[in-house]
């Protein structure tokens, strides 16, 4: 009974608990000065609202927006995050409930889900993979140097290419099967 209560508490953990208990310690491990509110800015004001966190360099100039939701309640939050990032000119956005981390490039082409570079589920991935992805996109030095954004853009191009292949391969295969083969006709 105690374990089921614990699981229920995790599921009902409010956004603030996810921010304080998961996000900020993760950012700290990734080298972010989480106590410098000019660099890791909570409740960053944007036109029409506030984003949960803005990761800034130089201070108060956001490079990444992070929106935090309760565990399992991140559906639909991508639209709000995209609007904030797009109107503010922020090149990268992260949506997390602490367990799942979705990394987006709001300025790229396509629907919201098509602009997702990577979706990381901390419970489904190997620890090394999770660490590698978090460092790739969110490590302080990589973000400040622009390497994180370059990596995200390269990963986006790979995802977009794979999506294009998936869309065109069935049509190409069908046209090959429909076309008469001149070698067989002779």
Where in this protein do the model-derived segments appear?
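A short, conserved, highly charged catalytic patch centered on acidic carboxylates
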Residues: 1-92, 100-186
């Amino acid at each position: 009974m105690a374990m089921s209560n614990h699981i229920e508490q995790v599921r009902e953990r409010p956004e603030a608990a996810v921010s304080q208990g998961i996000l900020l310690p993760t950012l700290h491990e990734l080298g972010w000065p989480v106590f410098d509110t000019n660099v890791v800015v909570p409740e960053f004001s944007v036109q029409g609202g506030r984003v949960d966190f803005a990761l800034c360099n130089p201070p108060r100039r956001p490079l990444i927006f992070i929106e935090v939701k309760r565990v399992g309640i991140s559906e639909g939050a991508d639209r709000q995050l995209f609007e904030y990032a797009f109107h503010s000119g922020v090149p990268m956005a992260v949506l997390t409930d602490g367990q799942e981390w979705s990394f987006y490039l709001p300025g790229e082409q396509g629907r919201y889900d098509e602009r997702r570079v990577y979706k990381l589920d901390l419970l489904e991935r190997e620890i090394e993979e999770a660490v590698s992805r978090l460092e790739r996109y969110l490590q302080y030095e990589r973000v400040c140097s622009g390497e994180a954004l370059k990596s995200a853009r390269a990963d986006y191009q790979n995802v977009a290419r794979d999506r294009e292949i998936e869309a065109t391969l069935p049509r190409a295969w069908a046209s090959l099967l429909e076309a008469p083969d001149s070698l067989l006709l002779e």
